[in-house]
């Protein structure tokens, strides 16, 4: 039987030699599973779970920590999306061509990025080949009955005149997934008069909804990636271009609009429980994402130099946008057309989209200083990142961030013990604007005055 050696791209050791808390999920295990989120892919591992928010969103949790405490890496480089800014924001990574997924905890995680108290998850593919490849063609298809979903994949790689090229494509279309009748329960607030209130002993009553499917649980995405590299005795050099678009619903997000903090006020204004429920019954909450990345990556053997064995280097330019929007079905819009101005009176009930953008450029070097006694690496990173939020639910002003970091990792085994040490120094410069409380109050007064003018005009008519 042929021996298969799995090596960590982070530490550079085989799985049997690694003393760090690390899990490696192979590409074969990923490809045999149904299309699912990153969190669901790794939640069977020890100490790892997933915070699911529909079929598209599954944020990994490592040792009880998630969000900004767990960093997601794409081929050793931080995936700079906006998944850390909301529970319903998904990790924008394509697992269709993943060679392996590494879950790393411990000192070695500090070598690649800051804020990794929980750990890192590194998704590795072979788009920029580090060794010469042979011709390989893969065509795949998947059908899911629970959501009438279909997924098609295509992968091609070859060595053309000493140039390694690869192309990967994936298209996924999943509809709302089926649930047993009566599986979805709602808690409705009592808005009846005292006579109706006396008929019920509890403030809330539960009722079953025979819908047969979970609304806003759909997911659709399309991604492609092209890479090329040249390999020599001294190392390799290559580049890759990737693009992905996705759209997915956010289930249970809009019931009574409780998650937006104005459901009670809106319900009280209507006064009738049934009417308030029907108003949001056909609401559609969905998200669109768009991501483009350009990578340059390579490695050079420094044999003959006394200070280092080799140096790995990379550069990435990425543009990412995430748009969340509320909408109502056509019949609902017609039914409430006359109440359109009335809805605008309630602060925060705007149906306009909210867009998150993140544009970043990152460069780094990792020097291998290992010898026969110990393994050690030193990294240098430079990041320039611009983040902005626009729209009806924007909660921060545009901001720019510049980082310069130095990381150090040391590992040594002696007398049956393993010593691992990680050190990281960060210089971070944040710039942006601050909206004062006085400006916010003045803005609210202007909105209230504008609403009063609209009411006055309505009374005249």
Segments from the language model and where they lie:
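Short, acidic, small-residue-rich periplasmic hinge/interaction motif at the N-terminus
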Residues: 1-31, 67
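Signature of Gram-negative outer-membrane beta-barrel scaffolds
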Residues: 374-461
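Transmembrane beta-barrel strands of outer-membrane/channel proteins
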Residues: 139-143, 158, 167-173, 230, ...
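Extracytoplasmic beta-strand/coil segments of soluble accessory domains associated
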Residues: 39-78
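Short acidic/polar hinge/loop motifs at secondary-structure boundaries
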Residues: 78-105
């Amino acid at each position: 039987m042929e021996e298969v050696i799995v090596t960590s791209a982070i530490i550079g050791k085989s799985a049997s030699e690694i003393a760090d808390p690390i899990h490696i999920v192979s590409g074969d295990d990923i490809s045999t599973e149904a299309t699912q989120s990153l969190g669901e892919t790794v939640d069977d591992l020890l100490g790892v779970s997933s915070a699911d928010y529909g079929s598209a969103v599954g944020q990994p949790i490592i040792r009880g920590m998630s969000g900004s405490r767990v960093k997601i890496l794409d081929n050793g480089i931080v995936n700079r999306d906006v998944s850390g800014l909301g529970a319903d924001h998904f990790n924008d990574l394509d697992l269709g061509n993943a060679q392996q997924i590494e879950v790393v905890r411990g000192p070695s995680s500090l070598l690649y990025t800051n804020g990794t108290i929980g750990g890192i998850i590194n998704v590795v593919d072979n788009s920029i080949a580090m060794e010469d490849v042979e011709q390989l063609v893969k065509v795949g298809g998947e059908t899911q009955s629970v959501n009438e979903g279909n997924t098609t994949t295509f992968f091609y790689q070859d060595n053309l005149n000493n140039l390694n090229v690869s192309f990967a494509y994936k298209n996924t279309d999943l509809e709302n997934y089926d649930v047993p009748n009566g599986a979805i329960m709602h808690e409705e607030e009592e808005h009846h008069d005292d006579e109706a209130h006396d008929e019920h002993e509890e403030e809330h009553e539960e009722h079953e909804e025979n819908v047969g499917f979970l609304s806003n649980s759909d997911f659709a995405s399309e991604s492609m990636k092209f890479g090329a590299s040249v390999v020599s005795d001294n190392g390799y050099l290559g580049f890759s271009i990737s693009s992905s678009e996705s759209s997915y619903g956010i289930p249970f997000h809009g019931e009574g609009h409780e998650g937006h903090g104005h459901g009670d006020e809106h319900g009280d204004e209507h006064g009738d429980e049934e009417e308030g429920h029907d108003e949001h019954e056909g609401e559609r909450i969905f998200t669109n994402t768009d991501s483009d990345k350009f990578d340059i990556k390579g490695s050079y053997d420094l044999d003959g130099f006394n200070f280092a064995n080799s140096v790995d280097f990379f550069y990435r330019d990425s543009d990412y946008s995430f748009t969340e929007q509320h909408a109502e079905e056509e019949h609902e819009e017609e039914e409430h057309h006359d109440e359109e101005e009335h809805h605008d009176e309630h602060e925060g009930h705007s149906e306009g989209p909210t867009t998150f953008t993140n544009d970043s450029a990152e460069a780094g070097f990792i020097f291998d200083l290992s010898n026969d006694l110990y393994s050690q690496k030193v990294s240098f990173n430079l990041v320039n990142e611009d983040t902005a939020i626009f729209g009806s639910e924007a909660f921060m002003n545009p901001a720019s961030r510049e980082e310069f970091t130095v990381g150090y990792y040391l590992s040594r085994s002696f007398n049956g013990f393993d010593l691992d040490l990680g050190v990281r120094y960060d210089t971070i410069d944040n710039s942006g604007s601050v909206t004062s409380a006085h400006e916010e109050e003045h803005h609210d007064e202007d909105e209230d005055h504008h609403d009063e003018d609209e009411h006055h005009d309505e009374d005249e008519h």
